[in-house]
């Protein structure tokens, strides 16, 4: 199997707290995997670890053929992360934020322009500094930044949050198109009906571990809440 993500007994410590407490996970290239679980289960940490933003303390963790314990920088260039908060450079315009995202991943200016057009970020909006955007606009620009990176691995944390109906439909289209083009997608969501329609399979995270990796996309009861989330997504 050609794997995009391979974790074996992977542990990630935040201080003394094991946010990931021995994760075993295989994700094949081209899969769309729904990551489910209660708040504080470790979903956000798992996605951030896959993005090379959270260190692996022990165990094995390979993403896109790179060892996360040795080469996180190479991983960061090939992934796109949409977190809870829409991280943008507030002093840059929308257009410059997208160009920066494309350049940071080795993508092209044309990719940034295409992402801007696809997300409807044209006209006066392109020239606004990110600091002047509404919450919904920031979310759309952050999604466009992921698209501009042309990532091999999409990491989407509650991706539908903050988008209007048209934006949510567009996001679904983008996920399907990315998977059809060979990209891999991990999305964490509480909107099970919508997210399950996108996913090829789902996994449940609870207590920092994968509890069940064999679920069908059909929603099932969530595990009971555990510890609160200890990670802030930027």
Model-derived features: positions:
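Catalytic Walker B motif of ABC-type/P-loop ATPase nucleotide-binding domains
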Residues: 154-157
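ABC ATPase C-loop
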Residues: 146-147
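Conserved ABC transporter NBD signature motif
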Residues: 59-67, 75
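Conserved ABC ATPase signature
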Residues: 129-133
């Amino acid at each position: 199997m050609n794997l995009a993500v391979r974790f074996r007994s992977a542990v990630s410590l935040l201080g003394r707290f094991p946010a990931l407490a021995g994760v075993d996970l295989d994700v094949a290239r081209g899969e769309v995997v729904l990551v489910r679980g209660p708040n504080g289960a470790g979903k956000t940490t798992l996605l951030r670890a896959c993005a090379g933003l959270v260190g692996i303390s022990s165990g094995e963790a390979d993403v896109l053929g790179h060892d996360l314990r040795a080469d996180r920088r190479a991983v960061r260039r090939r992934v796109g992360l949409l977190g809870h908060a829409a991280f943008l450079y507030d002093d840059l315009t929308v257009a410059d934020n997208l160009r920066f995202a494309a350049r940071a991943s080795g993508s092209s200016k044309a990719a940034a322009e295409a992402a801007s057009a696809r997300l409807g970020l044209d006209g006066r909006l392109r020239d606004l500094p990110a600091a002047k955007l509404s919450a919904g606009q920031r979310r759309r620009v952050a999604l466009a930044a992921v698209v501009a990176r042309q990532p091999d691995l999409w990491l989407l944390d509650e991706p539908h949050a903050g988008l209007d109906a048209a934006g949510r439909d567009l996001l679904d289209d983008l996920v399907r198109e990315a998977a059809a083009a060979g990209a891999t997608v991990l999305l964490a969501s509480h909107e099970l009906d919508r997210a399950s329609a996108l996913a090829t399979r789902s996994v449940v995270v609870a207590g920092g571990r994968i509890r069940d990796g064999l679920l069908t996309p059909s929603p099932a009861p969530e595990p009971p809440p555990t510890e609160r989330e200890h990670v802030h997504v930027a």
